[in-house]
């Protein structure tokens, strides 16, 4: 399993690796910093997430709050099925602004 990272290239944030209780606290702060830098809409690309538990969902929701506070619309792309299922059983799926929904 890979160490988790968050990077930014322009308006795209890329999330990679394993999201769990060990990796999420550091990612939380890194993501908050990246969201606060700049302005305009962001896309969070989650296609590189290898594994996640409920801590990963909590991380996404926290970043959504950060983006809202910074007046930066955030769309989530490439949400892995494992994380989608966690959000679904937690009744939180409708809270996630998924890129796939934007085209529906």
PLM feature spans:
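STAS-like cytosolic regulatory interaction modules
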Residues: 1-55, 61-104
């Amino acid at each position: 399993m890979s160490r988790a990272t968050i990077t930014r290239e322009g308006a795209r944030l890329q999330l990679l690796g394993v999201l769990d209780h060990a990796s999420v606290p550091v990612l939380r702060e890194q993501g908050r910093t990246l969201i606060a830098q700049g302005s305009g809409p962001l896309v969070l690309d989650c296609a590189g997430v290898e594994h996640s538990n409920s801590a990963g969902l909590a991380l996404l929701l926290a970043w959504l709050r950060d983006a809202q506070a910074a007046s930066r619309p955030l769309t989530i792309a490439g949400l892995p099925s494992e994380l989608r299922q966690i959000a679904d059983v937690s009744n939180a799926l409708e809270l996630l602004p998924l890129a796939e929904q934007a085209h529906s």
